[in-house]
A protein has these predicted regions:
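A short, N-terminal "cap"/entry segment at the start of jelly-roll beta-barrel domains
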Residues: 1-52, 132-136
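Conserved short histidine dyad/triad with adjacent acidic residue
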Residues: 36-37, 50-66
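A cytosolic small-molecule/anion-sensing beta-strand core signal
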Residues: 47, 75-76, 92-93, 111
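Structural motif
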Residues: 50, 59, 78-80, 104, ...
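Short, conserved beta-strand element in jelly-roll/cupin
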Residues: 55-56, 65-82, 121
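A generic structural motif
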Residues: 82-84, 108
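Short acidic-glycine-tyrosine-enriched beta hairpin
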Residues: 85-101
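Ligand-binding loop in jelly-roll beta-barrel domains
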Residues: 101-129
Length: 136
């Protein structure tokens, strides 16, 4: 997937929240409604954090979040998370991992995958071309 098909860091940070507090969210309906190869929506906010739903088929560019950890929880499919040091985590349904702030990473999915992300509402996303550790 071309890099310019993803939202800019500013667009990602400014995404509106879909559901206010005390609103029932049906994750199956939300996931079924997304037809794009990549879509990331803010479902809800809790204090200074948010719950995002991401649907991905293909790869997401290398990036990091300077001031925010990011927790991934796979709902459907299989998500690979590659770190700049070469480690790769493969998550299936109901598996989760937290990526610490300042950790360069990228996600990919060979087939349609739905995951939830928990992070700060104002989490900054910094995109990079390729991590230094992989320039060899």
């Amino acid at each position: 997937m071309p890099k310019d098909s993803f939202p800019t860091a500013a667009e990602y940070q400014d995404a509106p929240t879909r559901y206010p507090a005390l609103t029932l969210i049906d994750l199956s309906n939300e996931a079924s409604a997304i037809q794009e190869q990549y879509k990331n929506i803010v479902l809800s906010q809790v204090n200074n954090s948010c719950l995002r739903m991401s649907v991905i088929e293909g790869g997401y560019p290398w990036h990091y979040h300077p001031h925010s950890d990011e927790l991934f929880l796979v709902v459907e499919g299989s998500l690979s998370i590659e770190l700049a040091d070469g480690r790769v985590f493969k998550l299936g349904p109901r598996q989760s991992i937290t990526i610490p702030a300042n950790t360069v990473h990228r996600t990919s999915a060979a087939t349609r995958t739905v995951n939830l992300c928990f992070e700060q509402v104002a989490a900054e996303t910094v995109f990079i071309d390729r991590p230094p550790a992989l320039h060899e």
